[in-house]
Amino acid sequence: MNRRLVGFLGIGAWVLFWAASVALAALRPSYSHVVNTVSELGAVGTPHATAWNVFGFIIPGVLLAIVGATIARTANPVPSLSRTLATVLLVLCGLAVAGQGVMPAVMANGVADVASISTRGHFVCSLISAAAWAVGALLLVGPMKRNPYWQNVYIVSAALVVLTLVVALALRGTLPDGLAQRIGNAFFCVWFILMSLKLVWLEPQLASSVRVGGPV
């Protein structure tokens, strides 16, 4: 698949995620972006839950899996164990996001029913998506530094991962759940958007390099 197209898909995944979040939350007057987590939009039995799970989790997750694989293989063009692991982890990240929509949480008054298999699966997918992304992205920092086409983003990439982890640990319990989650999601989102933009801008450069016989 054309890397430029994949880059646009990565941007589109997040546009869809945030647009669905805003639109579906607006249909629930009691929902607060500060207090409520995004999982509550798709909780079993809530209004428009299926719409959120499809447009907020499943479609964006599948797109992020495709984008993640392309980012890993483009940023690290040399076949290696590190490249394979980064590719697998970023694909797993996207699929785990989609998995949160396949297994929505069961909640009552904003409290998760941890006895529910679906709820447990939802939270496991959430943890997997975060951990797989963090490790996968960090595995690409070295290759990005060595790749002349990606050298200008390796520091930002590492910083966004660190910021996401710091926010996840530091803000838990100090801010309302919805706000803390969205701040963490913002760094996660920015990483994918920046890397997707890199794919969009990079494709013409790579095509030009191939035409003149330069390195890919």
How does the language model describe each region?
Residues M1-Y31, N36-L206:
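Hydrophobic, aromatic-enriched alpha-helical segments typical of multi-pass transmembrane helices
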Residues Q205-V216:
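Short, intrinsically disordered terminal tails adjacent to the first/last structured region
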